Each structure stands twice: as C-alpha cells, then as structure tokens.
Amino acid sequence: MHERYVPADVEAAAQSDWRAADAYRSKEDANRKKFYCVSMLPYPSGKLHMGHVRNYTINDVMYRYLRMNGYNTLMPMGWDAFGMPAENAAMANGVPPAQWTYDNIAYMKKQMQSMGLAIDWSREVTTCKPDYYKWNQWLFLKMLEKGIAYKKTGTVNWDPVDQTVLANEQVIDGRGWRSGALVEKREIPMYYMRITQYADELLNDLDGLGWPERVKIMQQNWIGKSFGVNFGFPYELDGEKKLLRVFTTRADTIMGVTFCAIAAEHPLAARLAQDKPELQAFIDECKRGGVAEADIATMEKKGVATGFSVSHPLTGAPVEVWIGNYVLMSYGEGAVMGVPAHDERDFAFAKKYGLPIRQVIAVEGETYSTDAWQEWYGDKTRAVCVNSGKYDGLAYDAAVDAIAADLKAGGFGDKQITYRLRDWGISRQRYWGTPIPIIHCPSCGDVPVPEQDLPVVLPEDLVPDGTGNPLAKSDAFLNCACPKCGAAAKRETDTMDTFVDSAWYFSRYAAPDAQTMVDARTDYWMPMDQYIGGIEHAILHLLYSRFWAKVMRDLGLVAFGEPAKNLLTQGMVLNETFYREDAAGKKTWYNPADVTVSFDDKGRPVGAVLKADGQPVVLGGIEKMSKSKNNGVDPQMLIDHYGADTARLFTMFAAPPEQQLEWSGAGVDGASRFLRRVWAFGFANREALAVRAPFDVAQLAEADKTLRREIHGVLKQADFDYQRLQYNTVVSAAMKMLNAIEGAKGATPAVLRETYGVLLRVLYPVVPHVTYELWKALGYADEFGPLLDAPWPKVDEAALEQAEIELVLQINGKVRGALKVAKDASREAIEAAAVADEMFAKFAEGKPAKKIIVVPGRLVNVVV
C-alpha cells in the first residue's frame, strides 16, 4: 500500500482485477431476487458529457448497493446509433455515417470503462447493427399482419431545392436549413403504427407505475382523452349533400358559432379553390409552413374567407367557411367550429377579420365585452347558457347532453370520446436508419420481405450529400426481385423512426445472443426495476416504449405490458456562462476553464476576465451545460486530473439525483481532499486496522462505545438514504463517519477496524476504486471476500443504546444549557437535576421554581 493516494494507479489496479474476474457479468438465477437497472442508452455523439457521468453513476451506485444486499443485479449498456446527427456529420466530414458512429462508440466506451462502471459488456447492443435491427423489421412485419402497422399518406416538410424531406428542427423560419429554400408541405405515403388502439391502456396503466407524477401528467396530457361531440354542418356542393364534420368539447357554445375554419389540406378547401386563385395562393402559402404542432401554436394565425357557407345544424343559419393556417388536417376532422365569444384563439381571429362575436354563456356577476378577452369567457364550471333558445339556463353538462341529443336526432352527430394522441408515423425519408422491409413490385404492389430474407441490410458505405436519400441512388440496395412473382422490383427507401430502435433495447439486453427477438431470459429480467433518464424523454420515448411492450405482449413474445416499474429522471448539470457581445449583437461564449472569476466576501461571482487577454467578459448566469453556451466540463479531463472516483463523488454529493446539479470547481477539489483523507487514515493506521480480534461489546471502554454508537447511528441513516436514492446524504453520512473515526481518542484497534470497514462499505457504491483497493490492502478481503460482494454492514442496535441522554434545559422558556440524565431517569430525578444545575442557579437569580415541565427525551423547562 502506497502512502500517497494516486487515483490513476488505484483505479487501474481495481479495474484490472474486475476485468480479470469478469466481475460484472450477470447470469439469470431463479433462486435470487433480481434487480435490473438501466440508464437510457446514449446517442454516440463523440464524447461523454457530465449529464452522462451523472446518469451512469446513479445507476452504478444503485447496482453496487443492491448487489451487496444479495440481489442478482444487472447493469447493461448500448448505443442508440441511428439518426440524423450521423448523417449531418457525414456530410460535413465526407465519411460514411457508419464510420463516424463506430469511431464515436469506441471512444465513448473507453470513457465509460475509465469510470469503473459495473457494466456487463457481454450484453452490449448497437442499434445500427443488423443483428439488432433485424428484429425491428421482423416485428414491423408482424404488426403489419395484425393491422397494427399500416400505410397512409402523411404530411411532411419538403425542400424543393435539395429534393428531400426535412425534420421539423431542420426548418428554420420556414426555410430549409441547408438550401435556404422555402419549405413546402407535401403528402406522401408513409407507414404508421396504431398506438391509438392502446390509448386507454396507456392511460390507465400509468396508475400502477412508480414514476414521477409530472411524467405521468405529461403522458396523460399527450394522450389527451377528451369527452365531446362529433357533428357536422350540412352543405350542398356539386349536387351532393354533405357534412363538414368537427369535434368539440364545448358543445354548450354551439349557438355562438359564427364561422368554421378548415385546414389548407381539407378536401373542401381544394374544391373551393378550383376557380379562386386567391384561395389557391393562400393554400400554397399554408403548405410552406411547418407541420409541427409547436410551430402552429406560435405562428401568426391567418385566414381567408372562401365565400362559401355551411348551415348551422340546429338553426339552419348560414355559417361562413374560412381556410385557417392554424387548423391541422392531421388533428381531429381538419375543421373547427369558430366560437369567438368563448374561445381565445377564435376571439383573436374574429377581431382580426371583423367576424361576429356572439355571447352564449354567462357567469353570474360578470359582464361580457368584446373589447378584450377575459379568462372567464371560456369558463365551463360556473357558466350557464344564454342567448341559446331552448338551452338557456343550462349548465355545461346539461347543455352538452341536450345539444348532443338534438344533434343525434337530426342525424348530424353524437357524443364521442377522442384522443389528442395520433398514430405513430414511423417512415423517415433518411438513409441512416432501419430499412423498412417492403418491396415495391409493378405487378404485386407492396410486398413484405419474407422472414427468411431478414434482415434487409443497410449499406454502410454510403455518404449522404443532402440532396435526397442515398438509398434511392444505390442500385445495389434499390433493385431486387419481387418475392411473389420474381419480376424486377425496388426496395422501400424510407427508414424507420429512431424511436423504434430505442423502444425495446432493454428487452434485447436480457437476451442479446437470442436467435429470436427475445427468449425466456427476457421474462426473467424484465420489466426493468429502475429506469434512469432525462425528463426530456417523458413523452415520446417513454410512451413508445410502453406501446411496444404491449404489442410484444399481445403477440405472445413477453409476459409483461410495462417496460419499467420505476423511473428516475435525473436533474440537469448546470454551470456558469460567460460571453462577449459584438456591435452586431452576436455573442461569443467562453468556457469557464478559460475565465478567471472574482468573488465578493460572500462567495458570489461579481466579475470575470478572459485568461487569454485579461479583458472582461459578461457573466451570463448559470445554465444547463451545452455546446451552444460553451459551458461544459470535459469528463475525461476531470478523470485524468482527479480520477473517476472524485468525479463520481462530486456528482453524487452536489445534489439529490432528481434535482439540478450546479457545477463547482471548489466542490470537485473538496471531493478529492476527502478521498485523500480516507486513504491517509487507512495508510497511517494500517497496522492497527490489520488486527482481527473479536471483542465483547459489553466489556468495551467508553471511547469504543462512543465511536460504535456514532458509526452505527450514521450507518442506519445511510442505509435508509440508499434505499430512497438520496445519495447526496449518503456521502454526508460517510463524511461524518470519517470525522468520527479520525477524532476517536482511545479507541481500540479492533473497533477501529470494524468502524473503518463500515465506512469503506458505505462509500464503496459511490467510489468503488479507492474503497476496493483499501479493502484489499488492509486485509478485509481475506475476512469478508472482495468488496464487490462483501455483505452490507448490519446496524448493531445495541450499539445505539445510551446509558445517558441529553435534554435541553430551559429557564422560563429560554434555552440556557443542556442536562445529562440517565436514560431511564424518573420525572422526579430529572426535576431534581434541573434545579441542581449551575445554569438554574445562574439564571433563576435566587427565585424558587414555580413549575417544572418535562418533555420526555427532549427538554426540561423550569418556570420561576
């Protein structure tokens, strides 16, 4: 054992032992409790960031603690390796996405290994490899057979210059990110999955999950179950009688309809524009907008009158039809009823275009005015119908019932439950993704690739150039024979949404070498006992993975319908930001490592200068670490300088896992100093700590009893904190233990050995390298076995017993001191001790005690 703690040497030695023993390979064991904990697999972007370090350390701590407690634990890792960033990098660097991806994986894997994570690398999954995505294709075909997957036209962003489809994030101010061309909306055939078929189950099953409440609420809102009325406004066109259908949750306001708005893609819009160039021009303008719901919500609401009217289903009055850029064809019926008096968006639209505003609900004590929108205009809890004929005086529920009944009687509509959730469109007009296993034959149409021909392998040598999908230009990939008739045919060039890849990887970890999609091992490990990832995945990834599990269950592949029992959403890692702004308002951001900060006497930053030139920079405040703000900390530099254990210790100590973590260089230094103290104590006392002598608890001296009482008391709290995932207070507990052990005067070697051994085990899940090496060097491994599987220390309740307790002493309600009494002292004895105490004599000023109040175990108050 070396005198000085050298993290690089300590960590290399520990990791060498773990590799030699294949220490983290997990096997199924039906006789043991299992614990399967998974961090959301990373995208191989090139380097780990501190968010990764925090996530994986949380997982690792959980794994090690539970393994010491007898669980059969598994912590796997993989790579979410398909996706657009690889294509962008390929275009920038002129290399195939595969090369960029595999190089990044190799580097990031090396970084993870340097962190000492308890990963079972034999289960590694890479989603861009054919042995993985084969099963995406296989399940897609099964879903196609069952009608869960299907084909229909969908709206996409089309770049007319690059001749390619753009993701929503590639549309900037209505233009293509590369070409700058005005983006168009296009309808193209795409594949969808019927997630809506599972809407109620996805909603109801949230109740049984140990997930954060805000994640559940986000999913509930995304699924968006609504109770309303679906009905139509009758009209006649080209000699045909039809209904313009809408869905509303506010049927009670139907008498206030003054217009209807339809989407630019609505069939009625196309028909009405046939002989009206101004309508067609507006439709074309709408098609150049984004297709994302978020874009629609924030853009200016525009409309154009068609000059065509439909009839109100209950009054027969004409209702003018408008085309609105805010109406999405993909949501509801592609048409909405306009009730300006009681819908804020309709109110603004009506004011802009001078449309009638008709009040049809009222709230007692409130006065309606069309001058400005007020919150109560949309109230349905206190409102009653007015100006609504036979429905006047009815509250919301009664009005909806009566109006729905009348609409049904007239053949116009009825009550309906609807969902905000839409079927999952999985087609992506991109190269770097799972090929959709469909062949297009001129004679047979769309033909599924036969199961024996799977996987359809994605060529890895193509380099995208931004002008269309490279697969469509690759004859070797594109051209094939029809499996049905043998004629010349072409492969589907769309690939699958990368959310497909991440929808089930945790099931494949359980059986990575299976010749089927999953096998019995999957039902042993799944569902995950703990899933860990960022709140940004609360909706799409987590919702799709829940849907995928239910589909796999219904196809008889697995026994579970939910992939994760518990979810932890770790907080973001924050850091200071610094910048300079030029005359044009452009900001240049500087990394905190390149800046010298000055602080006031309370430690608050008050100024900063750039190290390179000594000139001031602006303090931009604390924000999430990001490339855009250049405020990240390179984990590799941290590990190289301080060691992985220091990085792990700081990230666990700085904040509870679910809360934001503010980066602190001083905090990292403090973590490093603490580990040096742990090592230094072990080295300085190595001979005493090597003594393995039994001791009789009853015969221990007071110094030993005091130390054991403190250590076992802190151990009890630390164990509780491990169970509730409060790792920051676990580290606090370890610090208290070290303080107690260092300050123990007169403790015997045997008790020092016991208590230091407790400290090493409490710290081990957080800082495994230094504790593992100390455990081995000081002979604990000879007694208990390697620290990896050493039993978790048990709290000695007898050690917590005290002969004396300390009570707060108050005189006339003011704290004046402390009173030591026997643990089982009677009330009379406590009262006598209180009046005999020197503090009573000092503050009573010769007055006798009138009354003595004793709160058992806490305080005694003498009233004079």
Curated annotation (Swiss-Prot):
Keywords: Aminoacyl-tRNA synthetase, ATP-binding, Cytoplasm, Ligase, Nucleotide-binding, Protein biosynthesis. A motif ('KMSKS' region) lies at residues 624-628. ATP binds at K627. The keyword Aminoacyl-tRNA synthetase applies. GO terms for cellular component: cytosol. A motif ('HIGH' region) lies at residues 42-52. Its EC number is 6.1.1.4. It is an enzyme of class 6 (ligase). It catalyses: tRNA(Leu) + L-leucine + ATP = L-leucyl-tRNA(Leu) + AMP + diphosphate. SUPFAM superfamilies: Anticodon-binding domain of a subclass of class I aminoacyl-tRNA synthetases, Nucleotidylyl transferase, ValRS/IleRS/LeuRS editing domain. It is found in: Cytoplasm. GO terms for biological process: leucyl-tRNA aminoacylation. GO terms for molecular function: aminoacyl-tRNA deacylase activity; ATP binding; leucine-tRNA ligase activity. CDD domains: Anticodon_Ia_Leu_BEm, LeuRS_core. PANTHER family: LEUCINE--TRNA LIGASE, MITOCHONDRIAL, LEUCYL-TRNA SYNTHETASE. Belongs to the class-I aminoacyl-tRNA synthetase family. HAMAP family: Leu_tRNA_synth_B. NCBIfam families: leuS_bact. This is Leucine--tRNA ligase.
